[in-house]
């Protein structure tokens, strides 16, 4: 693939060198050319910082670090849009949208950083900072029960399916005493979706992966998207009664 500067809804358009088809970066799909309608698989990815990744994966086998590309004139140590880590007057924090949009969705601040997720053909944009503040957020995408958990070691939001075993009601989770607990059994879970203590020890949840985007770009490309926070989030009142956990429906 390569980019020649063309944009659609303020999002990069890619060209594959084999057929010349045009691809949407945010959809991961060809929208024009011989491969029109062809999609790419999403691979697991976390947008984190090097210092966190280095610590978490230090002891892991088969970990590779990509080398900075050589040649050319691009400085890969400098972000041309400023720094998303430092509050101030830069592209990550101000209201500028440099290129035209077909629509601007007002449900979130345009520069809100979201994880855009598709589950069973339902789309949802998840506010990463909302998950960071709440620690644990139970929600639905269509009829699929999900939970977003803040992984403090990587400083990322991770999304899991709350259906642990077939035939049983989906679990509900809460943040209590600095730990992730399911409210039915009070078992303790980690941010990797694994139960590490209690009646459900050894159980695990399936993780879902999406794409990282600004809200304005995700919503412009996917106007039918739901949101977190929003109506899909399980209310806090439902988390106060363990015997009601299996009765919470979208």
Where are these regions (language model features)?
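Mid-to-C-terminal functional-domain signal that highlights helix-capping/loop sites
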Residues: 1-250
């Amino acid at each position: 693939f390569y980019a020649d500067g063309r944009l659609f809804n303020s999002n990069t358009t890619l060209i594959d060198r084999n057929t010349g088809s045009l691809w949407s970066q945010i959809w991961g799909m060809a929208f024009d050319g011989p491969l029109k309608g062809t999609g790419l698989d999403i691979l697991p990815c976390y947008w984190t910082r090097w210092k966190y990744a280095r610590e978490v994966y230090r002891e892991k086998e088969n970990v590779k670090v990509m080398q900075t590309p050589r040649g050319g004139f691009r400085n890969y140590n400098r972000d041309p849009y400023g720094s998303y880590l430092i509050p101030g007057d830069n592209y990550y924090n101000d209201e500028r949208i440099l290129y035209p949009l077909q629509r601007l969705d007002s449900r979130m601040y345009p520069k809100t950083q979201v994880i855009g997720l598709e589950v069973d053909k339902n789309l949802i944009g998840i506010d990463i900072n909302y998950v960071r503040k709440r620690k644990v957020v139970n929600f639905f995408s269509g009829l699929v029960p999900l939970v977003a958990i803040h992984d403090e070691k990587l400083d990322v939001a991770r999304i899991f399916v709350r259906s642990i075993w077939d035939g049983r009601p989906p679990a509900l989770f809460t943040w209590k005493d600095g730990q992730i607990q399911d409210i039915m059994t009070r078992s303790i879970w980690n941010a990797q979706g694994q139960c590490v203590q209690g009646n459900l020890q050894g159980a695990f949840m399936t993780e879902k992966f999406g794409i990282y985007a600004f809200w304005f770009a995700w919503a412009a490309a996917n106007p039918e998207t739901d949101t977190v926070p929003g109506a899909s989030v399980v209310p806090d009142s439902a988390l106060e009664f363990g015997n009601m956990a299996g009765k919470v429906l979208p």
